[in-house]
């Protein structure tokens, strides 16, 4: 499946049905009076989040979306039926913007819904305009037009852990070894061309990890492919920085990524960060210890060591305990789907 994280679509909510102008016609009733019914409301266009979708691929093939119009009213005070709402499922983490680039809605939680295009109100039938001074009104109103607009959808993947690092650091191998993620793995730059999600289950708890591809020097300016995916790091609560321990200068490798995060969005470097020296099976134990101490002294952080032979249980266990503790201390979030 292709990964699409941005799309532009045209929305047209349903028009309201027209009201009806009619009069009661029955035998032996000379002046039956007005009995025109109201028109039905037009259908709304609703966006809703789904756990079963992780891309905006649907909108590559469906760029014009129209809801059903309301039906007109009829005699005997019968109201027209309202048009059906269209409910469009999008991934959690989707943001909706209007043509001016103003945020309409941020769909960042499960089972979130928002009406993006409001259907038109149905017209009023002439039965509603009968008064003591006007017993036979012929007046009725037309249904209102439904909203129409162009919107832009932008997906920012939400995960517990964002895996960052230079190409070939072993991010995809790490993700694949500890989750059920099916990622392409090879020894050349930019093997991973799109974000991959994986779910690890440790100590009966769930941990969602995202492999963020393409981070190199100048990524924030568009070099490599990192500028397309730096935005996904914004939605990761914690960063897992993987460094290839076979590199001559691991400090430079570390600072290269940190600099790109800072230049893209200075808030990113304030995210909690765990550091892993990867591919430790390719070096002597003495050399690994030396590099671990060097990086620990420089970053003032605990350094984990990993290799393809490890099951990474200790690293994941530490991460999941940290995330669980962090979530336990978080403020409860109450969502109102109609308060944009």
Swiss-Prot record:
Coarse class of the protein's main subcellular location: cytoplasm
Name of encoding gene: obg
Subcellular location, record wording: Cytoplasm
CC cofactor: Mg(2+)
Entry EC number(s): 3.6.5.-
Location of the OBG-type G domain: 159-325
Record flagged with keyword Cytoplasm: yes
UniProt name for this protein: GTPase Obg
GO CC, alphabetical: cytoplasm
GO annotation (BP), single: ribosome biogenesis
Binding site for Mg(2+): 172, 192
Superkingdom of origin: Bacteria
HAMAP family attached to this UniProt entry: GTPase_Obg
Residues bound to GTP: 165-172, 190-194, 211-214, 278-281, 306-308
Role description: An essential GTPase which binds GTP, GDP and possibly (p)ppGpp with moderate affinity, with high nucleotide exchange rates and a fairly low GTP hydrolysis rate. Plays a role in control of the cell cycle, stress response, ribosome biogenesis and in those bacteria that undergo differentiation, in morphogenesis control.
Keyword annotations: Cytoplasm, GTP-binding, Hydrolase, Magnesium, Metal-binding, Nucleotide-binding
Oligomer and partners: Monomer.
Membership in a protein family: Belongs to the TRAFAC class OBG-HflX-like GTPase superfamily. OBG GTPase family.
GO MF term set: GTP binding; GTPase activity; magnesium ion binding
One Pfam family, short name: MMR_HSR1
Domain Obg, first and last residues per copy: 1-158
Keyword presence, GTP-binding: yes
């Amino acid at each position: 499946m292709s990964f699409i994280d941005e799309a532009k679509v045209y929305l047209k909510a349903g028009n309201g049905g027209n009201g009806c102008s009619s009069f009661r016609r029955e035998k032996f009733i000379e002046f039956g009076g007005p009995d025109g019914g109201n028109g039905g409301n037009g259908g709304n266009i609703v966006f809703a989040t789904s756990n079963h979708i992780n891309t905006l691929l649907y909108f590559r093939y469906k760029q014009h979306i129209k809801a059903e119009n309301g039906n007109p009213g009829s005699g005997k005070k019968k109201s027209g039926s309202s048009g059906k709402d269209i409910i469009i499922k999008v991934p959690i983490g989707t943001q909706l913007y209007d043509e001016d680039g103003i945020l309409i809605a941020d769909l960042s939680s499960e089972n979130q819904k928002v009406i993006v295009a409001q259907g038109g109100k149905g017209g009023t039938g002439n039965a509603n305009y009968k008064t003591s001074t006007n017993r036979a009104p012929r007046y009725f109103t037309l249904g209102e037009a439904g909203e129409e607009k162009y919107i832009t959808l932008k997906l920012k993947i939400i995960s517990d852990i964002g895996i960052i690092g230079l190409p070939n650091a072993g991010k995809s191998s790490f993700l694949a070894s500890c989750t059920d993620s099916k990622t392409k793995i090879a020894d050349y730059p930019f093997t991973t061309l799109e974000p991959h999600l994986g779910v690890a289950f440790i100590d009966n708890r769930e941990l969602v990890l995202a492999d963020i591809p393409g981070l190199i020097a100048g990524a924030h300016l568009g070099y490599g492919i990192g500028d397309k995916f730096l935005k996904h790091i914004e939605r990761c609560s914690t960063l897992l920085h993987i460094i290839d321990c076979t590199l001559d200068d691991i400090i430079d490798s570390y600072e290269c990524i940190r600099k790109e995060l800072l230049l893209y969005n200075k808030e990113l470097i304030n995210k909690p960060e765990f550091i892993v020296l990867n591919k430790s099976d390719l070096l002597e134990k003495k050399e690994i210890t030396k590099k671990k101490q060097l990086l620990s002294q420089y970053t003032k952080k605990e350094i984990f060591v990993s290799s393809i032979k490890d099951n990474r249980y200790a690293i994941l266990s530490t991460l999941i305990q940290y995330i669980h503790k962090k979530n336990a201390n978080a403020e409860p979030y109450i969502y109102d789907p109609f308060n944009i």
